[in-house]
Amino acid sequence: MQWEVVIGLEIHTQLATQSKIFSGSATTFGSEPNTQASLVDLGMPGVLPVLNQEAVRMAVMFGLAIDAEIGQHNVFARKNYFYPDLPKGYQISQMELPIVGKGYLDIPLEDGTIKRVGVTRAHLEEDAGKSLHEEFNGATGIDLNRAGTPLLEIVSEPDMRSAKEAVAYVKTIHALVRYLGICDGNMAEGSLRCDCNVSVRPKGQAEYGTRCEIKNVNSFRFIEKAINTEVRRQIELIEDGGKVIQQTRLYDPNKDETRAMRSKEEANDYRYFPDPDLLPVVIEDSFLNDIRATLPELPPQKRERFQAQFGLSVYDASVLASSREQADYFEKVVSIAGDAKLAANWVMVELGSLLNKQGLEIDEAPVTAEQLGGMLLRIKDNTISGKIAKTVFEAMASGEGSADEIIEKRGLKQVTDSGAISAVLDEMLAANAEQVKQYRAADEAKRGKMFGFFVGQAMKASKGKANPQQVNELLKSKLEG
């Protein structure tokens, strides 16, 4: 039997406010336990929450960016459940009237196509505290620094049909919230966490299968692995005659398996009701218009512009537009070098590889956009070849200066004098007389393969400095002669 995978995601984004959503406590990551917890965060009697307007502004900004309905009358509700790191015994969230309603995201896929994924809603809520198990020898410590940190929970429609589509969706959200400046997107620190709702059904069946939720997955790689692992588990279970039970599960990356955490709750299990301590939030048109006027050019628009203006593929444009800093870097390189496709290749491949090796973000790149643009100019005017450019790039990354300084200092200027190249070729061909003889006796198919050998020998003899185009032209003439 053929199976279809159905995936919906809930993404918790920690909003980049300076203080918590209902108190004035700071939200700095990594502070000493319980040093950023006020009486409001601790749920002490007699204290009242006060809504942080900046959190509202950020939520509205996100809603406008995904072309969503904005709940201009939205209500906070109490979500009642017991957990040791939830001091009030309830979490302030939103249920029936969220701040952001239906919207959508267009996500770029690996095959160059664009898929539209619906967003059901996005609502504001407070984060819970954190349970600490390892430091207390069989006991559990509670750190309430995180309690009350503002979250925007983004709930998708079950529109994704593979783990790769799910990862593409999360990457699109990740890029968007960073563009907007509403979340730093640091998954390692928990700023962006994902719950994956996964089910399977026979191909062609309209009814959804029983879903399981995988909680708190915090990396793109683990999202893909967790979903694929859970899909395999469900299919094997059904094919063995079993039945999928609706559960909340955890993914164990060390064992590459999901395991049951608890039975999956429904909304009525939490006994939601409007929070009597918080008035309904009324959002005026003027507030919306002010926020709309501050929206930057967003990844989808930037991607489309890169395609139209620079002739880039959907994939290349999507990668380059995936972060604001990378897009700015690329455009600066293009403004200097004047060749978008060459710039895209160097930014994505050579610079990307360098940053990955050194564990750096693009705004920490050891090669500036001005330096890279200057080097690409030297490729375009034939001062250096593409191969020599890699040597120049490595030298720039090591702090040896600009491309022009390195080319001059190391004597890397490309040889374009036809006479000098011809002399190198004559010497190389004389040293490979037997291969020349074989080439001339060969048919066209074999000649094509052998020609590459001679080009390689010529570039080796010139120490990579000979102009490749001139080498090809002169070499062909000499071999055919």
Curated annotation (Swiss-Prot):
The Gene Ontology biological process terms listed for this entry are: glutaminyl-tRNAGln biosynthesis via transamidation; translation
Going by the UniProt record, its keywords in alphabetical order are: ATP-binding, Ligase, Nucleotide-binding, Protein biosynthesis
Reactions listed under catalytic activity: L-glutamyl-tRNA(Gln) + L-glutamine + ATP + H2O = L-glutaminyl-tRNA(Gln) + L-glutamate + ADP + phosphate + H(+); L-aspartyl-tRNA(Asn) + L-glutamine + ATP + H2O = L-asparaginyl-tRNA(Asn) + L-glutamate + ADP + phosphate + 2 H(+)
Instruction: Spell out the molecular function terms from Gene Ontology.
Output: asparaginyl-tRNA synthase (glutamine-hydrolyzing) activity; ATP binding; glutaminyl-tRNA synthase (glutamine-hydrolyzing) activity
**InterPro entries linked to this entry:** Asn/Gln-tRNA_amidoTrfase_suB/E, Asn/Gln-tRNA_Trfase_suB/E_cat, Asn/Gln_amidotransferase, Asn/Gln_tRNA_amidoTrase-B-like, GatB, GatB_C_1, GatB_Yqey_C_2, Gln-tRNA_amidoTrfase_suB_CS
Protein's UniProt keywords contain Transit peptide: no
Query: What Enzyme Commission number(s) does the record list for this chain?
Result: 6.3.5.-
Query: Which EC main class describes this enzyme?
Result: ligase
Q: Which domain of life is it from?
A: Bacteria
- Pfam families, per database record: GatB_N, GatB_Yqey
Q: Which residues form the signal peptide?
A: none
Q: Which SMART domains match?
A: GatB_Yqey
Q: Which family does it belong to?
A: Belongs to the GatB/GatE family. GatB subfamily.
User: What is the purpose of this protein?
Assistant: Allows the formation of correctly charged Asn-tRNA(Asn) or Gln-tRNA(Gln) through the transamidation of misacylated Asp-tRNA(Asn) or Glu-tRNA(Gln) in organisms which lack either or both of asparaginyl-tRNA or glutaminyl-tRNA synthetases. The reaction takes place in the presence of glutamine and ATP through an activated phospho-Asp-tRNA(Asn) or phospho-Glu-tRNA(Gln).
Assembly state and interactors?
A: Heterotrimer of A, B and C subunits.
Q: What is this protein called?
A: Aspartyl/glutamyl-tRNA(Asn/Gln) amidotransferase subunit B
Name of the gene encoding the protein in the UniProt record: gatB
